[in-house]
Structure formats: structure tokens, C-alpha cells
Amino acid sequence: MKKTKRIFTALSHLFSPKWWKKNWQRVVLLFFFAVFALLLIFRFVPIPFSAYMVQQKIANLLQGDFRYQIQYDWVSLENISPNIQLAVISSEDQRFPEHLGFDFEAIQRAIRYNEKSNKGIRGASTISQQTAKNLMLWHGQNWLRKGLEVPATMLLELTWSKKRILEVYLNIAEFGNGIFGVEAASRYYFKKSAKNLSQNEAALLVAVLPNPIIYKVNKPSLLVRKKTSLDFETNGKFRY
């Protein structure tokens, strides 16, 4: 009992505002060091899992869903169809080959759109930002997560090539409830490997990326079908 009390006392000190005010610089430096070390390791080896996969698993367990399973199969970029490589860049981040992690033109367009429109908020996250968020952080709209995303993205661009960023993004992106990565998605929805995806199949997978829980590959809504057609048309004009 005394040991438990000591543990709770220590934790209360750790999470107190006074402790954070005194040690926040150390925490930030430790975060940067941990992220940099992680990126150096994963520059060369397959990613076993992402922070977002862990978040989803824990969230489902807390909700009492013990049957929730993660489907995930790592494949190299050479074993991913150029159709979906092209589709995801064309749809999600056309300036991906050029920018250094942040598309400031897209950010300005999103700000102008959000100021004038009441139809919802338009984002401007790049493939690099989404990769950093999915791999190392958590999903949410709080300022802490958004603040950490900036240095994490900068470190990602500093340590990885564009091809590596795209490879990891396609392997850890969510394409359905518990379905992570283009290989698992290809086998689940189309019964084939990711290297054999057609242009239309690639466009359909990319169309659900904004919200793969609401938008369904196997039951595409009118919006998804329209986006698939638009992505398919755009892909034919876009070159990477």
C-alpha cells in the first residue's frame, strides 16, 4: 500500500505544472533526440508498426472491442504499383517532389478558403506531414500535437529521401477500419498484391484517404465515386 502511494505521489509531481515549467526544455530536447534516433533507424529498416496503429488498437480496447485486428503487410516501394504512387501524389500533395515538408502555397489557399467557406475546413497537410504524424504522433486537433508535427516533419525531410517518405506513407496510411498500408488494402479489397493495382483501383484507394472510416472502398458513396473519377482524370495528366 505504501509503495502504491509513493508511485502515485511521484506521478503527481511528474505531471504537476511546476515540474513541467522547470523541465520543459529537457523534455523538448529528449523528444527531438528520440525522433531523430527513430528516423535514423527507420531510414533503412521496415516499419513494424506506427504510433497511429497503437492509438487505434488502444482506443478500440478501451471501447470494449477486443476483436479489433490490425491488417498490415510491409512492402518495398519497388513492389508498389506506380499507379498508386502517382495517384497519391497527384491527389494529396502535387508539390511533394519539390517542397521541404510544407506546402506554403497550399496553406495560403486553405486559409483563404476557410475564411470564406462555411462548408467545412480544408487542410493543407503534405505527405511528409502525414507520414510524421502517422508514424510518431497521434491524431487529434490539439495544439501540442500540431506543434510537435512541425519539427518532426523537418527532421523527417532532413533524414529521409522523398522515395523513403513515400514508401513509408503508403505502408502506414489507413485505408479502412484496421487496414493499414497499400499491400493489406490491395489484398483485402481487390485480392491482389499492391504491385498489380490498376489505375482505377489506385484512384479508388486514394479517394478514401481523407477519412477511411467514413468513406468505403468496397461501398463507395457518390462522393467517393466522383473523387475517384476526378483522381483518375488528374493522374493521366500528372507526371512524377
Curated annotation (Swiss-Prot):
Transmembrane stretches, start-end: 27-47
Gene Ontology MF annotations: pentosyltransferase activity; peptidoglycan glycosyltransferase activity
Subcellular location: Cell inner membrane
EC number: 2.4.99.28
Domain of life of the source: Bacteria
GO biological process: cell wall organization; peptidoglycan biosynthetic process; regulation of cell shape
Enzyme class (EC, first level): transferase
Pathway in which the depicted protein is active: Cell wall biogenesis; peptidoglycan biosynthesis
Catalysed reactions listed for this entry: [GlcNAc-(1->4)-Mur2Ac(oyl-L-Ala-gamma-D-Glu-L-Lys-D-Ala-D-Ala)](n)-di-trans,octa-cis-undecaprenyl diphosphate + beta-D-GlcNAc-(1->4)-Mur2Ac(oyl-L-Ala-gamma-D-Glu-L-Lys-D-Ala-D-Ala)-di-trans,octa-cis-undecaprenyl diphosphate = [GlcNAc-(1->4)-Mur2Ac(oyl-L-Ala-gamma-D-Glu-L-Lys-D-Ala-D-Ala)](n+1)-di-trans,octa-cis-undecaprenyl diphosphate + di-trans,octa-cis-undecaprenyl diphosphate + H(+)
One Pfam family this sequence matches: Transgly
Primary localization class, coarse: membrane
Topology term for the membrane: Single-pass membrane protein
Gene Ontology CC, one term: peptidoglycan-based cell wall
UniProt keywords, alphabetically: Cell inner membrane, Cell membrane, Cell shape, Cell wall biogenesis/degradation, Glycosyltransferase, Membrane, Peptidoglycan synthesis, Transferase, Transmembrane, Transmembrane helix
PANTHER family: BIOSYNTHETIC PEPTIDOGLYCAN TRANSGLYCOSYLASE, MONOFUNCTIONAL BIOSYNTHETIC PEPTIDOGLYCAN TRANSGLYCOSYLASE
Role: Peptidoglycan polymerase that catalyzes glycan chain elongation from lipid-linked precursors.
Family: Belongs to the glycosyltransferase 51 family.
Listed name of the protein: Biosynthetic peptidoglycan transglycosylase
Naturally occurring in which organism (per UniProt): Haemophilus influenzae (strain PittEE)
Gene: mtgA
